[in-house]
Amino acid sequence: MYLSRIPGGAALAALLVALLLCCNFPPSIAGIEYSDVLPDSFPSAPAESLPHFLLEPEDAYIVKNKAVELVCKANPATQIYFKCNGEWVNQNDHITKERVDDVTGLVVREVQIEVSRQQVEELFGLEDFWCQCVAWSSAGTTKSKRSYVRIAYLRKNFDQEPLGKEVALEQEALLQCRPPEGVPPAEVEWLKNEEIIDSTKDTNFLITIDHNLIIKQARLSDTANYTCVAKNIVAKRRSTTATVIVFVNGGWSSWTEWSPCNNRCGHGWQKRTRTCTNPAPLNGGTMCEGQQYQKFACNTMCPVDGGWTEWSKWSACSTECTHWRSRECNAPTPKNGGKDCSGMLLDSKNCTDGLCMQNKRVLGETKSHLLESTGDVALYAGLVVAIFIIIILLMAVGIVVYRRNCREFDTDITDSSAALTGGFHPVNFKTSRHDNSHLIHPAMQPDLTANAGIYRGHMYALQDSADKIPMTNSPLLDPLPNLKIKVYNSSTVGSSPGIHDGNDLLGAKPTGTYPSDNIMNARNKNMSTQHLLTLPRDSSNSVTGTFGSLGGRLTFPNTGVSLLIPQGAIPQGKYYEMYLMINKRENTVLPSEGTQTILSPIITCGPTGLLLCKPVILTVPHCADITTSDWILQLKTQSHQGNWEEVVTLNEETLNTPCYCQLESHSCHILLDQLGTYAFVGESYSRSAIKRLQLAIFAPMLCTSLEYNLKVYCVEDTPDALKEVLELEKTLGGYLIEEPKPLMFKDSYHNLRLSIHDIPHSLWRSKLLAKYQEIPFYHVWSGSQRTLHCTFTLERYSLAATELTCKICVRQVEGEGQIFQLHTSLEENVKSFDPFCSHAENSVTTQLGPYAFKIPFLIRQKICNSLDAPNSRGNDWRLLAQKLCMDRYLNYFATKASPTGVILDLWEALHQDDGDLNTLASALEEMGKSEMMLVMATDGDC
């Protein structure tokens, strides 16, 4: 029970006792303690102060059914009572204790009560159960702070339990834990393999204020089971165990030393390897990316074994009756590790003539020896003459047979200027009659009527092959004296020499390229020994061509895809049937992952596994807008298992990068040492990259019903993508209404919106229920759907309506757009717009030998000889690469045997359409190579 008031008699008695006690204090003490409350006029009459709490009741928690005790102390205090939830506690429930303070002499009163679980549970309302002390003295009352009494508990389930994870070595790991609800709030500690984590001892661990565990830098020793433990005065709870695995990604060891050249003589390969052991993958870490070995072309000087010269004449007979003869080991001298001559350097034998004084023979014996020696000499001389005559006869017979066999195939061209300039042009032309014979004048025009001198096969100089063009300061195109070029003609060559369609090369002999059937037989024999993939035969998405050491170009018409095989890329004497194939995306695992987008067709060039002596150049179109620097561009290749692997990230090349990419505005030229399947992908740094698209509208060629469909295709801005849509619509009976329009599509997560407007409602109506259609952003950006389109279905009220005018608007939400103003006829004789009509003449797929290149071989050779050697002034191949804008990563060219040759090959690939040699001439002139200045011009139709 609680009391509502305090008895008056008890209060009066307490007041009198306090006054008597105060009168016993010394005046000095009383003055110090009560100077702030008594007036200055009564310093000798002290008064009792307000009660001061020495101990106030604390918050308490009831565990199970055990009551809690609340205690308070105060002085000076005549009475102390508890007040709980605004009501006085019954006097009988108080336990009071009194004592006198030894220092102050004041009475210290202590009061104690108990609060049970039942009292707390009987309280209704939102406020917790509370109690406070009220103390009295003669000066008045003082209240203590409130203490709250709550029933303690701890729920069983955690609000959030830690989850196991895998973390890379030395990376940060976060384990989250939200303990169960409880009163008082639970304290949290973490266990690692059942041992408490002390973050003060191991500073690699951090326990945050919200009870999360952070591993700052994961160590292998941190691989363990982690448990979050929550506890308070009631109970202790454990979370489920979270397993943390610290994994190690594999790292490459250092490269080994280059192995010796595998060929003791001539061209070969050097190899070096590395292992994925620095560190080795651990606990599920990834294997190393990149090549495990590298190859490097080498050229070892062939060893020359020594050979003896002829014996010298015998020396005069000495007094010891001995004469000598000698020989030298210099025919040839041993070089490059060749063997020394074996045998004797000096030879001696006994003699009896000369100064020899022993065993004099009679004159008759001497004469007989002389006659015998004379007979031997005559015999040997006769044999030598007979052998010489036989050799002459055999040579004469061989020459006669050779001339008879080659009478229909040989033509000698003695004009060196015509031979040289003929290398510049794929057809014959009339030479300019100017005095300066070492320049090619820009006024030279192709002679389309002349047939003499047209190149139809291999070109051979009849001079010694060892007579190479030296590095000189003389003009590059000096007249070549008495140069003869042997040209093999063939009666089966067509009107375009050196140019063949890919279908003619599948199993058929490439006429006009190889002079005899023996070479083709050799080619078939060589190819039969190669372990190559089967060539594709689907002419709709592949082209093929047969190439030898003279190289050539394989072009996929109307797709922007081509393969340039430089001269010397294929080993001498071998011929390969090579192919290009555009893979259908619906049948191929896509190379893009995450936020990456496909930027080019997926191209397979083969056969794979070819041993190439020089890099080939694969040209593929792309649809990235490279005017912005927000792209991360990658070239990927597909392994035999079908997985895509990164070959190179542009601008992150290293010496181990196996290829080089020359990026142009609409295409990429890739120098490859290995043939295979390749694709170009990209993603943006900050979601501002732009992808070029094409919008094409198709309508049915013939419409006999009231419904009329307009299809709006959204494809990548590459020729092959539009070509695929054109072929698809042709099979469906559709035609292209007007020229496709470009659209810049930004990586902004906004969809592509299409709408139709200005329909003549008196004749037509739209069956589209909404105001517009949308293509989701990811469908467009990913590039996975090649024939992405929307269809607008219109209905005419009568078959008499044969014309339709309307507008179609295509735009990216909050981005760019295009508007098509359409006017189409539904009559039968409609003409489809053909975007490739201007390129119809470029349907040639294969160019062989010199016809594939703009720079003649002799001029190319002289440029390489002049620029390959490093120059202290810097005007060597490095400056040429800079002038031609091919200097993004010069270390790639530096690893090649002829850096200039690779740069010129890349220039050929970049200028396959224009063939403007003036750019090369200007670059050489700016380099200060005045002796190489060329006046180059190409006239004629593209």
Swiss-Prot record:
Residues 150-245 form the Ig-like C2-type domain. CDD domains: Death_UNC5B. Residues 402-942 are cytoplasmic. Residues 863-940 form the Death domain. Residues 1-30 form the signal peptide. InterPro entries: DEATH-like_dom_sf, Death_dom, Death_UNC5B, Ig-like_dom, Ig-like_dom_sf, Ig-like_fold, Ig_I-set, Ig_sub. Disulfide bonds join C72-C133, C84-C131, C177-C228, C261-C298, C265-C302, C276-C288, C317-C351, C321-C356, C329-C341. Residues 51-148 form the Ig-like domain. The chain crosses the membrane at residues 381-401. Glycans are attached at N225, N350. PANTHER family: NETRIN RECEPTOR UNC5, NETRIN RECEPTOR UNC5B. Interacts (via extracellular domain) with flrt3 (via extracellular domain). Interacts with rnd1. Plays a role in cell-cell adhesion during embryonic development. Receptor for netrin required for axon guidance. Mediates axon repulsion of neuronal growth cones in the developing nervous system upon ligand binding. This is Netrin receptor UNC5B-b. The lineage of its organism: Eukaryota, Metazoa, Chordata, Craniata, Vertebrata. The gene is unc5b-b.
